[in-house]
């Protein structure tokens, strides 16, 4: 498959059209880091449980640059489904059974069905990559995975899984071999590589599904920063088998992508031209605090309320609590939500404690930042 896009189509898809290169004549300098540092990054990642199970959750990531939610969501979903490592039963030994095309007297399921059931058993190991699980049962009973006792280093996650059904007086002895891996490994592939002669003669390979992800999907919605609504919100819905949590699965997928992208970065960030160290670069707090509130895209009502309360800089604003703001005349919940969203986009919030505020020469420092 060939994927090809030019800059004009990307600009049109994003709702913008290029009008010329403002930097070609040396009017402004673009540092290497500007290509990524100037982009909007998510101010929050919210984990919302889906129901009572901790294994299902929605992760809400916003705000993102237009188009980024689809790009990131698709990459994260594919990596989660294909590349996360987990544990699975890859083979069994059943007493008096030499191959899978066998029926066992007194056992209602044939060996093929038993292997299919066992392949769906979910296991979590701690501090090891492999383990042999043993189970001895006497009928009549239903043999379920929960009959395998948990230990400090091994937990059966789906304890109600039916393995087989025994009639009166039937003994059922089985060993299950568990190891770590990724993706799906069919039994035929396992047989082709197990030619070392060190496995038991009655070892039967099983299909092994190692992925800890049961379901993963995503959707894209619009997000906003102030009055601008051309941003993305990414909502990822993840369900795991219980060996890891949904937010851990997304974090691992992101780390895999980070590692895979590393070879594409063919420059050293330390080679950038040395930038003059300004006083503003050594301030002990966020530079956004020096911006004036009239730079924010506030509604007229919200701006007038701040002005009447003598709030000039964002640093003045964030030191107010929500209760303080709601006591301001004509300032209501709608204005509060508007300000909270704007502050969150800058990784700020109401009720912050800022030492040594305001700084000396705040007016000149604020002007330097506005000109940057």
From Swiss-Prot:
InterPro entries: DNA-dir_RNA_pol_insert (IPR011262), DNA-dir_RNA_pol_RpoA/D/Rpb3 (IPR011263), DNA-dir_RpoA (IPR011773), RBP11-like (IPR036603), RNAP_asu_C (IPR011260), RNApol_insert_sf (IPR036643)
GO molecular function, one term: DNA-directed RNA polymerase activity
Keywords for this protein: DNA-directed RNA polymerase, Nucleotidyltransferase, Transcription, Transferase
Region (Alpha C-terminal domain (alpha-CTD)): 280-372
Catalytic reactions of this protein: RNA(n) + a ribonucleoside 5'-triphosphate = RNA(n+1) + diphosphate
Any GO BP annotation: DNA-templated transcription
Cross-referenced Pfam families: RNA_pol_A_bac, RNA_pol_A_CTD, RNA_pol_L
Listed SUPFAM superfamilies: C-terminal domain of RNA polymerase alpha subunit, Insert subdomain of RNA polymerase alpha subunit, RBP11-like subunits of RNA polymerase
One GO cellular component, as annotated: cytoplasm
Sequence segments annotated as region (Alpha N-terminal domain (alpha-NTD)): 1-268
CDD domains assigned to the protein according to its UniProt record, in alphabetical order: RNAP_alpha_NTD
Entry EC number(s): 2.7.7.6
Keyword Transcription applies: yes
EC supergroup of this enzyme: transferase
Function: DNA-dependent RNA polymerase catalyzes the transcription of DNA into RNA using the four ribonucleoside triphosphates as substrates.
HAMAP family cross-referenced by the UniProt entry: RNApol_bact_RpoA (MF_00059)
Similarity field: Belongs to the RNA polymerase alpha chain family.
Recorded domain comment: The N-terminal domain is essential for RNAP assembly and basal transcription, whereas the C-terminal domain is involved in interaction with transcriptional regulators and with upstream promoter elements.
Protein name per its UniProtKB record: DNA-directed RNA polymerase subunit alpha
Organism expressing this protein natively: Ehrlichia chaffeensis (strain ATCC CRL-10679 / Arkansas)
Lineage of source species: Bacteria, Pseudomonadati, Pseudomonadota, Alphaproteobacteria, Rickettsiales
Gene (name only): rpoA
């Amino acid at each position: 498959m060939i994927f090809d896009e030019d800059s004009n189509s990307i600009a049109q898809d994003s709702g913008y059209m290029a009008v010329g290169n403002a930097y070609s004549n040396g009017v402004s300098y673009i540092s290497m880091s500007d290509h990524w540092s100037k982009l909007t990054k998510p101010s929050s990642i919210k984990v919302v449980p889906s129901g009572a199970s901790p294994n299902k959750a929605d992760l809400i990531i916003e705000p993102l640059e237009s188009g980024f939610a689809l790009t990131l969501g698709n990459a994260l979903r594919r990596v989660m489904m294909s590349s996360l490592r987990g544990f699975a039963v890859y083979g069994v030994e059943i007493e008096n059974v030499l191959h899978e095309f066998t029926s066992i007297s007194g056992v209602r399921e044939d060996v093929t069905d038993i292997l299919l059931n066992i392949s769906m058993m979910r296991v979590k190991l701690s501090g090891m990559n492999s383990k042999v699980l043993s189970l001895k049962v006497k009928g009549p009973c239903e043999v379920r995975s929960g009959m395998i006792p948990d230990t400090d280093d091994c937990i059966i996650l789906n304890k109600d899984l039916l393995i087989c059904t025994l009639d009166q007086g039937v003994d059922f002895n089985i060993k299950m071999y568990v190891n770590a891996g990724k993706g799906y490994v069919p039994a035929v592939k396992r047989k082709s590589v197990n030619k070392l002669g060190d496995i038991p003669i009655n070892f039967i390979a099983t299909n092994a599904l190692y992925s800890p992800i049961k379901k993963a999907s995503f959707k894209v919605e619009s997000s906003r920063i102030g009055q601008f609504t051309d941003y993305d919100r990414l909502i990822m819905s993840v369900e795991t088998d219980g060996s890891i949590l949904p937010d851990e699965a997304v974090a691992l997928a992101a780390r895999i992508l980070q590692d895979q992208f590393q070879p594409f970065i063919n420059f050293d960030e330390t080679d950038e031209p040395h930038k003059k160290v300004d006083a503003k670069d050594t301030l002990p707090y966020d530079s956004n605090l020096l911006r004036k509130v009239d730079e924010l895209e506030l509604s007229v009502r919200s701006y007038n309320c701040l002005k009447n309360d003598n709030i000039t800089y964002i640093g003045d604003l964030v030191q107010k609590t929500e209760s303080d703001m709601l006591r301001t005349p004509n300032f209501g919940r709608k204005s509060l939500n508007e300000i909270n969203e704007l502050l969150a986009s800058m990784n700020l919030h109401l009720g912050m404690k800022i030492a040594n505020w305001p700084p000396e020469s705040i007016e000149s420092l604020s002007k330097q930042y506005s000109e940057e």
